[in-house]
Amino acid sequence: NVLDRLGYPTRSAELAGIAGYLHDIGNVVSRDHHGQSSALMAMSILSRMGMEPAEVALIMAAVGNHEEEYGHPVNEISAAVILADKSDVHRTRVRKKDIPTMDIHDRVSYAAERSFLDVDAEKRVITLTLTIDTGICPVMEYFEIFLTRMTMCRRAASVLECEFKLEINGACLL
């Protein structure tokens, strides 16, 4: 969707979609370094399906670089995957619904009532708009766990020759 809106070739958007679908498949092996596990698993699956090696390599690069601990937006496909993955925060992702027992990650996600990634192709601006219930989680807790993700989004937007903005509860913060 990000690449489509910015006018990238349809095939690039399709490859980003495939990479997005496969980016966390390595979690079946381990949460640690799952980006690399996911990339290797994607290579095996896509190669067996007959995908061109150059396209497999693009997907591997996107999948292997989506984690904030070690990833970098190395091309437009990886940039799109990073933006989609790192902006995916919403209460529907939380399994435990008992707020007092939630860790900070679940509390922040549960507090996110709305999350929307807007791509303004004309202005070359990508904006993540969030509505956070501050009765559940103060905005500062969002930054405690998401600052590195937002930094990664800014780098990804830059690869796409865009500016990245973050709006929380109507206030533009980045």
Residue ranges and their predicted role:
Residues N1-V2:
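Amphipathic alpha-helices of TPR/Sel1-like and other helical repeat/solenoid scaffolds
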Residues D88-L174:
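Terminal helices and disordered tails flanking the catalytic cores of nucleotide-processing hydrolases
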Residues L6-V119:
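Divalent metal-dependent catalytic cores for phosphoryl transfer on phosphate-bearing substrates
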